[in-house]
């Protein structure tokens, strides 16, 4: 009898038993003591309808974010993604994260990635962008390594107001290789202090807006950087309203692209943004897609400047990224194309307004801001000592509340990081306020 995924028919089994000279499978395994045998406990086969029903019952044990008011940000955000984005991005023609080495059969994917790079450059104000990195944290680490190659120095100063998990990844990448990571503090506004920068500093890394939601003063940061390169970690949607880092003289811009049409996740499927100046392109990691003309004179797209990559000697390559998250970049390209400049500005504006309304309502019931600097769509505020317990109980009311910060910043005990995006309604905010009382 044939079974799906089991290649051996009854005739195959009989032929194998005859070949080795035994009459049955039981005889084949007769040398194994009965006491050592156990049943596989495999259930009887089931039809598709009953399997689907069982899987649906199991899936209903999960909680859906669609049912929650989400005030939890800190690098991953609940946003609305138009249905057309996945209708296009999930077409079988596109559905691979593999590198499009064969340009002649990958023109659609290559064009989409080229357009992604172009839109990232427009958002960041930079001259060249690659076709994606793994995520925001590893993009920052690669930016630091790039700064070492460009300057010949081995020290990076990173603001403590950069996402704590990004800083952890940075240390993992750098310290075992002998590089130095120094953290710079922050002031009462929530903005970075740069007292640690010296002539041995290869680069300064700041976040804009930073982990606390505060909009960093990049003019100040640039003025304090001296000869060090300026690395700016961005939240891409915010750049629809804020001045791009390139206009402040940033040398490398990196970030997490999850806000650009990707779902919320817990440790998976992500997108690293990476952009820089054209003069540094030979030291930029990752894939780069270029536009050219084929033999017939038609516009064509292909991977370019591959001598930076692992096609050359490993020791000379700028990075050794393999099958990267190209499909995530494609989704981001579709999302940005669908939204357009005005749509992205509207998403950013609604997020900004929702966060500021939330902050005002929290202040009305006694919750004060922790920092005085201007914020985008996240902010830190003071909370009572028992807030972590309240935070967990909020989940029972379908609320993912603001994030308690003491675990990440011991000096910020009894504070929380609140986030609001374009999907947060006044009703959601009132629901949170009631749970906070």
From Swiss-Prot:
Q: Which CDD domains match?
A: GDC-P
- Pfam families membership: GDC-P
Catalytic activities: N(6)-[(R)-lipoyl]-L-lysyl-[glycine-cleavage complex H protein] + glycine + H(+) = N(6)-[(R)-S(8)-aminomethyldihydrolipoyl]-L-lysyl-[glycine-cleavage complex H protein] + CO2
> Which keywords fit this entry according to its UniProt record?
Oxidoreductase
GO molecular function, one example? glycine dehydrogenase (decarboxylating) activity
Indicate the enzyme's highest-level EC class.
oxidoreductase
Q: What is the scientific name of the source organism? A: Thermotoga maritima (strain ATCC 43589 / DSM 3109 / JCM 10099 / NBRC 100826 / MSB8)
Q: Which family does it belong to?
A: Belongs to the GcvP family. N-terminal subunit subfamily.
Q: What is this protein called?
A: Probable glycine dehydrogenase (decarboxylating) subunit 1
- What does it do? The glycine cleavage system catalyzes the degradation of glycine. The P protein binds the alpha-amino group of glycine through its pyridoxal phosphate cofactor; CO(2) is released and the remaining methylamine moiety is then transferred to the lipoamide cofactor of the H protein.
**E.C. code:** 1.4.4.2
GO BP annotations of the record are: glycine decarboxylation via glycine cleavage system; nucleoside metabolic process
SUPFAM superfamilies, sorted: PLP-dependent transferases
Assembly behavior: The glycine cleavage system is composed of four proteins: P, T, L and H. In this organism, the P 'protein' is a heterodimer of two subunits.
UniProt keyword annotation of Chloroplast present: no
């Amino acid at each position: 009898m044939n079974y799906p995924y089991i290649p051996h028919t009854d005739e195959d089994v009989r032929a194998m038993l005859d070949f080795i000279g035994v009459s049955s499978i039981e005889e084949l395994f007769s040398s194994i003591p009965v006491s050592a045998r156990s049943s596989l406990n495999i259930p009887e086969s089931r039809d598709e309808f009953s399997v689907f029903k069982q899987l649906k019952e199991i899936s209903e044990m999960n909680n859906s974010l669609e049912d929650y008011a989400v005030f939890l940000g800190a690098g991953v955000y609940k946003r609305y993604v138009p249905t057309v984005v996945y209708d296009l991005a999930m077409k079988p023609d596109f559905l691979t994260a593999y590198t499009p080495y064969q340009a002649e059969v990958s023109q659609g994917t290559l064009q989409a990635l080229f357009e992604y790079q172009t839109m990232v450059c427009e958002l960041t104000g930079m001259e060249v962008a690659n076709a994606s990195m793994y995520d925001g944290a590893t993009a920052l680490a690669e930016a630091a390594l790039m700064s070492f190659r460009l300057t010949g120095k081995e020290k990076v100063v990173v603001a403590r107001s950069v996402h704590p998990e990004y800083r952890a990844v940075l240390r993992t990448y750098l310290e075992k290789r002998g590089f130095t990571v120094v953290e710079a503090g922050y002031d009462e506004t929530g903005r970075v202090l740069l007292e640690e920068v010296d002539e041995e500093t290869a680069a300064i890394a700041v976040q804009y807006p930073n982990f606390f939601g505060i909009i960093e003063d990049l003019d100040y940061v640039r003025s304090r950087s001296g000869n060090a390169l300026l690395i700016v970690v961005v939240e891409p949607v915010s750049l629809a309203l804020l001045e791009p880092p390139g206009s402040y003289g940033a040398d490398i811009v990196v970030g997490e692209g999850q806000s650009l049409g990707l779902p919320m996740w817990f440790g998976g499927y992500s997108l690293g943004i990476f952009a820089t100046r054209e003069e540094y392109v030979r030291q930029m990691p990752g894939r780069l897609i270029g536009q050219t003309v084929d033999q017939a004179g038609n516009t064509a797209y292909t991977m370019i400047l591959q001598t930076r990559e692992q096609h050359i000697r490993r020791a000379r390559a700028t990075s050794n990224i393999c099958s990267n998250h190209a499909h995530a970049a494609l989704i981001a390209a579709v999302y940005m194309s669908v939204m357009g400049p005005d749509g992205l500005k509207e998403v950013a504006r609604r997020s900004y307004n929702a966060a500021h309304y939330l902050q005002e309502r929290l202040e009305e019931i006694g919750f004060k801001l922790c920092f005085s600097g201007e914020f985008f769509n996240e902010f830190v505020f003071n909370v009572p000592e028992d807030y972590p317990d309240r935070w967990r109980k909020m989940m029972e009311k379908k609320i993912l509340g603001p994030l308690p910060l003491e675990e990440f910043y011991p000096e910020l005990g009894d504070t929380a990081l609140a986030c609001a995006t374009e999907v947060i309604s006044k009703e959601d905010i009132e629901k949170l306020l009631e749970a906070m009382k």
